[in-house]
Amino acid sequence: MNDYLVKSIDKTKNLRLLTITAKGVVSEAQKRHDLWSASSAVLGRTLVGSLLLAGAELTDKEELTVRLLGNGPVGPAIVTATADLKVKGYVKNPHIALPPKENGHIDVKKAVGQGWFEVTKDLGLKEPYTGQVPIVSGEIAEDFAYYLTKSEQIPSAVGLSVFVNPNNSIGEAGGFMLQALPGASDALIDKTIKRINELPALSTSFLDGMTPEDLARKILGTDCKILEKDDVAFSCDCSKEKYAGILETLKSSQLKDMINEDHGAELICNFCGNKYHYTEDELKEILAKKKDDKDY
């Protein structure tokens, strides 16, 4: 099954739902960062949640960055998602595996720890906007929902799932984001939340072949309307040219050290793990552009 996101609405047009399958996205992140189980669960859920949030809120060339700033062993998770549903991200500590909980599941809450949940939106305005709430759960889905409810005043329910196989490969990944629109009654919201609470585990359902459309009908009812379906992907916009621009911001003395002592430089993208090597000659070209530097 390809990775994609579905937007739907209930028959009363008072509840909006986004559902997603994203095994390929999380698998790509797992391979690029060599993630172990707990790190995969934390980054995977944050990737899936960020795609849902981007699908719900972004248009045109807007983007958002989610920072899960926990003090647990996995460390911070940083994820950026765009309006066209491209996502990239990383965790500080990729090689974390923890003893499973009694039910056999990964202890995501322990992996995340306590701290802050931040969302920065770049909407093309002068200054990006950042909203921040405390991490209230550490299970990540509840933290997305709490952020939406408290920071953006959008009553929401979120479910996120990443199943990690014993060999650290990804068995499935997906989730949903339910948002109450202004006309939603308490009775409608309560009935829908009851449906969600009665669902089997998302991981089991996705492993059994459930699609985002199936999940939408389970949550909103079979009479819901599917509005659109969009592909999602792990994608990083880094390039050798972009990193050359970063090298140009260094002091000339630092570039000289790279040339004379290291005889080159290698830069690694945190988000995707791509490596970019610069030879002495390439560094000299960059240095030549800095002739006007006072420390040249």
Swiss-Prot record:
Under oxidizing conditions two disulfide bonds are formed involving the reactive cysteines. Under reducing conditions zinc is bound to the reactive cysteines and the protein is inactive. The gene is hslO. Its main location: cytoplasm. GO terms for molecular function: protein folding chaperone; unfolded protein binding. It is found in: Cytoplasm. The keyword Iron does not apply. This is 33 kDa chaperonin. Disulfide bonds join C236-C238, C269-C272. Signal peptide: none annotated. One of its GO terms (biological process) is protein refolding. Redox regulated molecular chaperone. Protects both thermally unfolding and oxidatively damaged proteins from irreversible aggregation. Plays an important role in the bacterial defense system toward oxidative stress. The keyword Hydrolase does not apply. InterPro entries: Heat_shock_Hsp33 (IPR000397), Heat_shock_Hsp33_C (IPR016154), Heat_shock_Hsp33_N (IPR016153). It comes from the Bacteria. Coiled coil: none annotated. GO terms for cellular component: cytoplasm. It holds the Pfam family HSP33. Belongs to the HSP33 family. It comes from Lactobacillus acidophilus (strain ATCC 700396 / NCK56 / N2 / NCFM). Keywords: Chaperone, Cytoplasm, Disulfide bond, Redox-active center, Zinc.
